[in-house]
């Protein structure tokens, strides 16, 4: 076994498709696949044409910078273990 497909393998796969899906449904499936690929290609091309325009747009800075929030209370002081046992 060399791991490659020969023409007999491809013929068997084609026959399986005909048996599983039927001869009437195969052309419809191929048409649907072709339409899907066409739509996919057009979307990819559209995204490639939009990408340079999106990168060229200037980035606007926010109008107002808010100061950092102040903590509501001072952090708690650690309790000494010796003082905690005597209480």
Curated annotation (Swiss-Prot):
A biological process from GO: protein transport by the Tat complex
Claim: Membrane is one of the keywords in the record: yes
Entry GO CC: TAT protein transport complex
Primary location class: membrane
MF GO annotations: protein transmembrane transporter activity
Membrane topology: Single-pass membrane protein
UniProt feature, compositional bias: Low complexity: 52-87
Region feature (Disordered): 47-87
TM segment ranges: 3-23
InterPro entries reported for this sequence: TatA/B/E, TatA/E
Subcellular localization: Cell membrane
Keywords linked to the UniProt accession: Cell membrane, Membrane, Protein transport, Translocation, Transmembrane, Transmembrane helix, Transport
Function (record text): Part of the twin-arginine translocation (Tat) system that transports large folded proteins containing a characteristic twin-arginine motif in their signal peptide across membranes. TatA could form the protein-conducting channel of the Tat system.
Subunit composition and interactions: The Tat system comprises two distinct complexes: a TatABC complex, containing multiple copies of TatA, TatB and TatC subunits, and a separate TatA complex, containing only TatA subunits. Substrates initially bind to the TatABC complex, which probably triggers association of the separate TatA complex to form the active translocon.
NCBIfam families given in the database record: PRK00575.1, tatAE
Annotated family: Belongs to the TatA/E family.
Record-given protein name: Sec-independent protein translocase protein TatA
Recorded name of the encoding gene: tatA
């Amino acid at each position: 076994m060399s791991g490659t497909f020969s023409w007999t393998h491809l013929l068997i796969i084609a026959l399986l498709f005909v048996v599983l899906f039927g001869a009437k449904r195969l052309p419809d499936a191929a048409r649907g696949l072709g339409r899907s690929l066409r739509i996919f290609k057009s979307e990819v091309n559209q995204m490639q044409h939009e990408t340079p325009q999106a990168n060229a747009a200037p980035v606007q800075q926010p109008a107002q910078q808010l100061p950092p929030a102040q903590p509501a209370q001072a952090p708690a002081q650690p309790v000494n273990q010796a003082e905690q046992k005597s209480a």
